[in-house]
């Protein structure tokens, strides 16, 4: 390493964000970048580890530990420290097709497994990664790389989220003719409509990369829902292989009285609507909008946070977020040792913004909704909540148990359900004759990504279930490699 004592000499530093009161006035990204000297100092904090844990991804205790795409983190940290930015970019692109996505929206399990993080703040890997790729775009180093020759084989990639885009780029660079079939009106899947613009800019970040893929020769077809207006069997006939990257899009519902009232929406419907409105699609009168309303978000994950941030920008009157789990500790608990992902209390951007306006953290823990109450017009006007505790049942499972006498009424004219996803939509797998697993995801081998139908592969959330963007990119790359091997008998793809 260029600076073996950097972790002793420099403290962790991350860029300042725009203030909550300022950034809620628009939908622009709110993270700043560090200057070059500061970035080089941060890269110098990367230790000369005997056994680095940051760069090797694995599932551990229900979460991710290390980098799922196996980024060469110690190598590009050292190159940044030495000012060799172009070489750092080359190392970064060896393993990650889209570091501008992960550098913005990844929760950074690499930092959770950083060796320095055992007893000090970890290296700011995520920020360094994003700085490398943005430097690459600024300098003109990120250019289309079309294949020199074509194999004559045609591959359909269904879905243009992170898994689909990674699979498409890898297969195209192997020389295959790739068509991406996307049912929405724009590319990106989750990247376009599932993540708000202030976290991932649609024009300056997502479409910038899409344009590169198009220039490399990848064809995108929009408003193409395979199994509906685009026949599944026609796709099988027209292409030599298919890679399914359709995501885990079936939302977990709230089966309580009043669920059918107007004003109760799934989080993804709300987030999609907000982005479409921002991009100028659809009549404003049809929007799901939070302006002037008492908003309740049910669910405490990243999607819930995105709903909070979006509602703040739309001008909600009040905002409350209910979480059925207990409040995490401020430091790792004994049953959450390094290098597991640290399950600790944090305040994300949406909660910061709500606290700045309303003077309190919007989250209420160990709380669930018992029923929704409507007005004479059939619109939700309030909900009834109850506090819960967690107990072990006869089967040894941890289950929530209501606490008597803790019912409360909460005003709400907009209720957003952000409780995760239960699996992939089943119509397309059924049309193709593909087996599903016990979790209602597409059954595909964890090494070969092959489904029960020869020539059809599956990657990303539709195979592994709800997960991270970085896992989706890793799976898209893996499925592309195995698809290329199936088509050609061997492969040079990583």
Residue ranges and their predicted role:
Residues 131-149, 206, 211-228, 251-314, ...:
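Glycine-rich dinucleotide-binding loop and its adjacent helix/turn
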Residues 24-41, 64-65, 69-104, 108, ...:
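Ferredoxin-type iron-sulfur electron-transfer modules in oxidoreductases and energy-metabolism complexes
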Residues 46-49, 54-58, 63, 67, ...:
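Short cysteine clusters
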Residues 87, 149, 154-158, 210-256, ...:
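Feature captures the FAD/FMN-dependent oxidoreductase FAD-binding
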Residues 304-309, 314, 459-493:
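A conserved FAD-binding loop/helix module that cradles the flavin
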Residues 260-292, 391-466:
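FAD-site-proximal beta/loop scaffold in flavoenzymes
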Residues 5-32, 41-44, 57, 70-80, ...:
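Beta1-alpha1 glycine-rich phosphate/pyrophosphate-binding loop at the start
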Residues 12-13, 17-37, 42-45, 50, ...:
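C-terminal catalytic lobe of FAD-dependent flavoproteins
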